[in-house]
Amino acid sequence: MKNILIGIVAGEASGDFLGAELIKSLNIIHSNIKFVGIAGPLMLKEKNVESWFSIEELSIMGIFEIINRIPKILNIRNKIFNRLSFLKPDLFIGIDSPEFNIHLEFKLKKNGIKIIHYVSPSIWAWRKSRIFKIKESVDKVLALLPFEKKIYDDFNIPCKFVGHPLADKIPLYPDKYSIRSNLEIDKNSVCLALLPGSRLTEINLLSKKFLYAAKIIKKNIFNLKILVPMVNSLLKKRFEEIKREVAPDLPITIFDNFSYEVMACSDFSIVTSGTATLECMLSKCPMVVGYCMKKINFFLLKKIIKINYISLPNLIAGKKIVPEKIQNECNPEVLAKEILIIFNDKKKYKKTKKIFYKLHKKIRCNSSYNAACSASCLINKLTIK
């Protein structure tokens, strides 16, 4: 039996999770498979995975941060292209990170390699013209969100809505008090989760605001317990440095990972935009979304972004169900005020959790298996369905 080689590139923590679940499913379908490229720590725990570069090399945000790293990023991309062109994998899967992956996919496809792009770029939000480059670069797009497929259908680009792996992994009814017991958290405490980001630039920009907000909330809720999950030791160290500077006396429990558990056992959260907002929704944890960036980045992006919402719960619902506080509105007083509104309005609190449940069911589709089946169709040179 011929061994199967798959090139794969994930660029940040959310892509690492998606990649790990996909690899797990593909390893079940194919016993003779190997993955090479850029993999994160979760992907590397799965069988037959080899990473040529650290995932941290691609985990950056902000226009000027990217500009400063362009030479190194281009060098990595060229090296990956050269290696994969030599190895001729049966399939290449680019997971998210479109600015890195789409160009790589375009060049690999020209070399006769089959291409899947896993996670639709946010063409519905900005730079919709990218869809023409995507059409030239991929054999199939795997979309995580239900409204994305129609966009590709309109341009005759093969696309499958596979659902979201987080929706499959997280139970519809999280056992809040069992999780609290496992984390040694008092079941009678009021818990606030702080999630200032999974990238260093986010930690630097948002941690102070979130911590100051937590100090205000603590003054209003006497039995408040503040929980903070951190995805790696680098971010944890930086967050602790900021805490010592702005809130040395604020009692906080920091967890290594355990992001789902922290959200599921919390009563509410302050969370940055991105996958964490989806995870909060799936954990049935009412939230306030806070996000800011450097002023010049915000000024430039404001000119080109064409959406009404930045958080995934609001985008999936097609309406505002969680408050979003962006840039100047993302300040401690406003964030704290929104959390206290959630805390005091029990009727709205319950309604929000019911909406979260309905949205959870909508995107719970056994997604990793669906994605693996789509990949297998290309591996086996079957007709794309």
UniProtKB/Swiss-Prot annotation:
InterPro entries: Glyco_trans_19. GO terms for biological process: lipid A biosynthetic process. One of its GO terms (molecular function) is lipid-A-disaccharide synthase activity. This is Lipid-A-disaccharide synthase. It comes from Wigglesworthia glossinidia brevipalpis. NCBIfam families: lpxB (TIGR00215). GO terms for cellular component: membrane. PANTHER family: LIPID-A-DISACCHARIDE SYNTHASE, LIPID-A-DISACCHARIDE SYNTHASE, MITOCHONDRIAL-RELATED. Its EC number is 2.4.1.182. The keyword Disulfide bond does not apply. The gene is lpxB. Keywords: Glycosyltransferase, Lipid A biosynthesis, Lipid biosynthesis, Lipid metabolism, Transferase. HAMAP family: LpxB. It catalyses: 2-N,3-O-bis[(3R)-3-hydroxytetradecanoyl]-alpha-D-glucosaminyl 1-phosphate + UDP-2-N,3-O-bis[(3R)-3-hydroxytetradecanoyl]-alpha-D-glucosamine = lipid A disaccharide (E. coli) + UDP + H(+); a lipid X + a UDP-2-N,3-O-bis[(3R)-3-hydroxyacyl]-alpha-D-glucosamine = a lipid A disaccharide + UDP + H(+). Condensation of UDP-2,3-diacylglucosamine and 2,3-diacylglucosamine-1-phosphate to form lipid A disaccharide, a precursor of lipid A, a phosphorylated glycolipid that anchors the lipopolysaccharide to the outer membrane of the cell. Belongs to the LpxB family. The keyword Zinc does not apply. Pathway: Glycolipid biosynthesis; lipid IV(A) biosynthesis; lipid IV(A) from (3R)-3-hydroxytetradecanoyl-[acyl-carrier-protein] and UDP-N-acetyl-alpha-D-glucosamine: step 5/6. Pfam families: LpxB.
